[in-house]
Amino acid sequence: MEQHTSHPNRKVPAKEEANAVPLCRAKPSPSYINLQASSPPATFLNVQTTKLPSVDHKPKECLGLLECMYANLQLQTQLAQQQMAILEHLQASVTQLAPGRGSNNSSLPALSPNPLLNHLPQFSK
C-alpha cells in the first residue's frame, strides 16, 4: 500500500520531496466489533482473573510507537525552526524595502527571536 505525503492536487518541488523525511507507518487497529468477537465479555466475576501487564513490561509495539512519536516530534520541531527562520528573513526583507517607515508606524508586528521555540520542550534520547 503506497502512501504519499503530499496532496494529489498540490505540486511539490522535487527538492522538497527529496528532503522529505518519511513518517512511521501507522498500524491498523482492530475494530470494536473484532475486539468484541475475539475477547470474552468482561463481567465482575472474571475481571479479577484478568492478567495485567507488570510495570516493567514494555511491549515492542509500544516502544516502536514511542520511538515513532519521538522522531515525529523532532521533525515537527525542525520544521517549526525552519518556518521561524523564513518568517524572520521575510521580516528583514520587508524592513529593507520600507526603510523610511519607523518601527512604531509599521503595520507588521515585530517578531522577537523565535518566540514560539523558546517554549518548546527539549527532548533527549
UniProtKB/Swiss-Prot annotation:
**Which domain of life does this protein belong to?**
Eukaryota
Asked if the record carries the keyword Chaperone, the reply is: yes
Compositional bias annotation for Low complexity: 103-125
What InterPro entries does the record tag this protein with? Answer: SSTK-IP (IPR031679)
Which keywords does this chain's UniProt record carry?
Chaperone
Q: Where is this region: Disordered?
A: 1-21, 97-125
- One GO cellular component from the entry? cytoplasm
GO MF, one term, reads: protein-folding chaperone binding
A Pfam family the protein falls into: SSTK-IP
Q: Does the keyword Chaperone apply?
A: yes
Q: Which family does it belong to?
A: Belongs to the TSACC family.
Function of the molecule:
Co-chaperone that facilitates HSP-mediated activation of TSSK6.
What is known about its subunit structure?
Interacts with HSP70. Associates with HSP90. Interacts with TSSK6; this interaction is direct and recruits TSACC to HSP90.
Q: What is this protein called?
A: TSSK6-activating co-chaperone protein
Its source organism is Macaca fascicularis (Crab-eating macaque)
Origin organism lineage: Eukaryota, Metazoa, Chordata, Craniata, Vertebrata
Gene encoding this chain?
A: TSACC
